[in-house]
Structures are given as C-alpha cells and as structure tokens.
Regions:
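Short, aromatic- and glycine-rich surface loops/edge beta-strands on solvent-exposed regions
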Residues: 104-121
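Aromatic-rich peripheral "rim/lid" segments of glycoside hydrolase catalytic domains that contact
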Residues: 298, 443-542
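Short, acidic/polar
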Residues: 152-164, 269-275, 353-361, 452-460
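Boundary/entry segment of secreted carbohydrate-active catalytic domains
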Residues: 124-176
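Aromatic/hydrophobic beta-strand junction motif of beta-rich domains
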Residues: 43-56
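Substrate-binding cleft and catalytic face of glycoside hydrolase catalytic domains
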Residues: 168-345, 381-382, 478-483
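Noncatalytic carbohydrate-binding groove/subsite architecture in carbohydrate-active enzymes
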Residues: 280, 310-445
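Short, compositionally biased P/S/T/A/G/V-rich stretches that sit at domain boundaries
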Residues: 23-43, 514
Length: 542
C-alpha cells in the first residue's frame, strides 16, 4: 500500500466528522470586535514568528488553524501554545509533520483562544494569515501593457492572432487534477510535496510549457483559470480532489477538508507556481480561482450549502492559491470568478456577486489582506441575445442594479475604485473582464453585424473606465461545447462553409485601440442607434 492509499483511508475517516456549517458563525466572526489581536505573522526560511496582544487574565493560548481545519472547537484546540504575557512574540518551526504530511505552516492562520476552565476553546481574536513570507524566488516584473485580450487561448493554426490583433492578455484553463497521478505512469515524472510523492504528466506539462512560453515571449500576460474536474486523470485521486459534498455540476470546489486532500491541491499549485514564475517555461502571471462561484451549483460545486459555508470554502481556496503563488511571484494577483448577477442570485442556488466581493473585503479586514482581485463575466442578461443595449432591462446604472453587463460597466468600475476596497487601502485591485462576449445567434449578416456592434460598445466603454485593467474576449472562436452559443471572434473551426473564418467582430477587435479604431467602429453607431460613442456613458447613482 503506497503512502497516498494509506493516507486516503485516514482522510475518508476524517470526512465523517466534517460538518458543512463548520461551527463558527462566519458572519458574526467577521463583524465581531475581539478582545485580543494577532498583530502580525512573519515567515522566515525556517520559522513562523507571531506577534500579538492577548486579553488580561490567565488561560490564553495561541492556536494554529490549518487550511483543512475550521474555526470550531476541534480546529481551535489543536496545536495550542500557552501565552504567558499580554504582549507576546512566539516563534515556531516552519515545517512540521502532521496528518501524514510534512506541512508548511506559512499556510496556517493563527488566533488567540481561552482554553483553561472552558469546555471548549473560546475564540478571542480573528485568525490571521501570514503577512510576510520569505520568498523562494523573486520573479521578474512583467507589466500589463494594454487592455485588449482573448479568452480560452490555445495553440492552433490561428495562434498568431495574438500578434495580428496586438493582444496583451489571455486566459487559459488548467484542469488541476488532470495533471498528476498517485503512482508512476508511462510518460510521467516525479515531484514530491509535503513528504508525498506525485507523478506529473509530461505530455500535458509540455503543452503548458509551449503555450505559456509563446505568450510570455510576446509580452502577453497570462491568467490561469484553475479548475477541479469531477473525475481526476488518476481515479485514485478523484476523492482526494473532489469536494465530499459535490453532487454534480461541471467542476468541483477543491477538497480541503483533510490533510491528504489539502496536500494534493497544494502540490499542484506549488508545481505550477514554481515552474511558471522563473520564465524558463513561460509565465503564469495571475490566477483565476475556479469558475463563476456565485453560481457554484453548476460551475464550482460543493452541493447545496449555506452561503457562509460556501463563501468560507472559496475564501480558503483563494488564500491557499495566493499564499503558495507569492512564494515565487510577489506581483501576482489571485482573482475571484463571477457571473453578471450583481445583486441577485441566479436562482435559489445562486449568490449575489456584490455580496461575495464585499465579504472578501471583510475577510481581508479581519484576517489580513492579500492581493485578490476580480475576474468578472459581464455577459448580456440573455447570453443568446446580442442586443444588450435594448433588451438588458434589469441592467441600470444604479449601484444596486440587478445585473452587470457591457451596458453598465460603470457600476463595477465605481466599486473597484473605492479606497475602502483597495488592497491594504492603497492599491486598486486588479479587475479583468475575463469571460464575456456577444453572441451571433447565426452566421447571417444581421446577426454578425449585431455581434460586432456589441464588441464596439464593450471596447469603447471599458477602454475609457480606469478601474478596468483588461478584457479577455470569450470565446476566441466558436466552441461546440458552449450550449449553442456563437460568441467567438471566429467561426467554428469545423464549420462546413468557412471553418475558423474571421467574423466582423474579429476585425472590430483587431482595430480596437489602434489608429483604425474610429474608422472601423463608425458604421456600428447606426446599428446601435447612436450619434456618438459618448452617449453610452452614464453616471452611477445610489
């Protein structure tokens, strides 16, 4: 029996005690003012150094909360360190053996609890993540030099579109649990993480090398969309990666409920962050964590959960990704992925995007800030209908608009530029429109023209809004797997009449941001019913 199989048995047993509600009332926790405070957590090469102020009296301890633990009685009573002085400084080894793995404690949270004389430990501070970590590498700066991008980029016969259109950013999907195996397979190579051996697929890694190098060699910023497939490439790893409450959908929330699952997820993130930060194999500049989590029942599934439990799981996943990525690239951003449902849920299974964003701010205020940003998907209300400027009736310029689409991008621009939403109160967070496009219901001339008109509107608006850092038009080309939509800039690659042919929207996107923009865009003013592009802009109202 190999180590992963043995640990899997232990981990499955631990799942029996995992509760979705996770003990602590998250909303109360984020809002509460505690009597104690963990002031800072600094991680050196070999030590974790924690400073704080505990309440007066006796019986207080420093509690380490690992990523697979909750802020409940079980999570808070492990790894207690007595605090003798009101103002304290404690130093602990960075690496320990626990749960069958060699664990890097730079990934933990640290909280003050009162344990003596209590039936269960009582939380007396917010739990704080590491503020500073000694880097493994300092990546070379790679600036974003323009707003125009493509979504779902890959290497094919049209790969040079990024040069033809002067593309400055792309997204690529990375199916994390398709990359590695629990035991050696033909064409795999070994990498150890946390004392556990994993074997990575050489063919899949070679493709990532080639596509990421192609982009970085041309100065193109790449954001990796991290996805957990419902089934792993190695069946043995399916229950390791897949969340125990996942009951369907297209992708799963990662399983971080036990040491083995945490370690496997961290192992693949560490591999990618390490390999694609040096520049030798290309770069991953930013990370988009999972897909459209406000409608997770379809796109990042962990079953039907209370909002607080789902949000807490997603926050942990974002934190883990960032805390690993920053070891190798301190300029990286970790972006949350959201639909156009600004203040409404998709249905009873969906959550409002603005609420999730504001709760990310609350987590940062409570547990220490990190470089998180927003990957917004401002599709039209009806993804099939390109005429969003007419038919998006639930889309207004109010801060409380139901939907956020190309029509009213001013709303999220205003939100991201508020100082209270800045990273550490100083730096505007990165905002990408990372998946969005207008549809051509058919390849008729009228439908293609309407699609192109929508692309003109989108570019004119976003290029003028300073809070929006970039857009990745999705899809680059029409895709048979997208529910009949034709939102690409090119036709289906297997189209019978003109396979992969450029649509009018392709030429709009090529002209965007160039000296040909006004000439190419001008005919579409009449299509939309405008006299001038300035008419599309509106003030945001309360």
């Amino acid at each position: 029996m190999n180590k992963i199989k043995a640990l899997l048995i232990i981990s499955l047993a631990l799942l029996l005690v995992w509760l979705p509600a996770q003990g602590t009332d998250i909303n109360e926790y984020l809002s509460k003012e505690y009597p104690g405070q963990v002031v800072s957590v600094k991680v050196t090469k070999n030590k974790v150094k924690i400073k704080g102020i505990r309440p007066s009296g006796k019986g207080y301890y420093l509690s380490e909360v690992t990523p697979w633990e909750a802020l409940d009685a079980q999570g808070l009573q492990d790894n207690l360190i007595r605090l003798c002085f009101k103002k304290f400084r404690r130093s602990v080894p960075r690496k320990i053996e626990t749960g069958g793995i060699v664990y890097d404690r730079s990934l933990s949270r640290w909280a003050i609890v009162k344990a003596d004389g209590e039936d269960v430990p009582v939380l007396c501070s917010h739990a704080r993540y590491a503020d500073e970590v000694a880097p493994v590498r300092v990546a070379t700066e790679m600036p974003l030099t323009g707003k125009k991008g493509l979504g779902g980029y890959r290497l094919n016969k049209f790969a040079d579109d990024i040069e033809k259109m002067d593309i400055r950013s792309v997204t690529i999907n990375i199916h994390l649990n398709s990359l590695l195996y629990a035991s050696e397979k033909p064409g795999s190579f070994l990498r150890e993480y946390g004392g556990v051996k994993y074997w990575f697929d050489s063919t899949k890694v070679d493709y990532l090398d080639r596509v990421l190098s192609y982009c970085s060699d041309r100065g193109v910023i790449t954001s990796a969309i991290t996805l957990i497939d419902l089934k792993s490439a190695d069946p043995e790893l399916t229950p390791v990666f897949r969340h125990p409450d996942c009951d369907g959908g297209f992708y799963s929330m990662p399983n971080m409920t036990n040491p083995l699952s945490f370690n496997a997820y961290a192992a693949v993130l560490d591999f990618l962050a390490d390999r694609y930060s040096s520049g030798e194999h290309g770069r991953i500049n930013n990370w988009i964590i999972h897909n459209e989590v406000d409608y997770g029942i379809d796109w990042t599934n962990m079953g039907k959960q209370p909002y607080e439990a789902y949000m807490d799981a997603y926050e942990k996943s974002m934190r883990l990704n960032y805390n690993i990525a920053r070891l190798y690239d301190q300029q990286t951003w970790t972006l949350g992925s959201y639909t156009h449902n600004w203040t409404v849920g998709e249905n009873e299974n969906g959550f409002p995007v603005r609420k999730m964003l504001e709760d990310h701010v609350r987590y940062s205020n409570a547990e220490g800030d990190f470089r998180w940003g927003v990957a917004q998907h401002p599709y039209p209300q009806d993804l099939n209908d390109p005429l969003f400027w007419i038919h998006d009736t639930g889309t207004t310029w109010s801060k409380d608009t139901k939907y956020l689409t190309f029509k009213n991008l001013e709303v999220i621009d205003e939100w991201i530029r508020r100082p209270e939403h800045f990273y550490k109160g100083e730096t505007k967070r990165l905002l990408f429109l990372s998946e969005n496009g207008t549809n051509s219901p058919s390849y008729s001339e009228e439908d293609l023209v309407n699609q192109a008109a929508g692309a003109c509107w989108a570019w004119k608006k976003l290029s003028a809004l300073p809070g929006i850092d970039g857009v990745q038009w999705h899809a680059w080309m029409d895709n048979r797997g997208e529910f009949g939509l034709k939102i690409g800039l090119r036709r289906f690659p297997d189209d019978e009449e003109a396979p992969g042919a450029e649509k009018p929207s392709w030429h709009v996107w090529q002209a965007a941001g160039t000296d040909k923009e006004d000439e190419v865009f001008a005919p579409y003013l009449k299509v939309i019913g405008l006299g001038d592009w300035s008419e599309i802009f509106h003030e945001v109202t309360d």
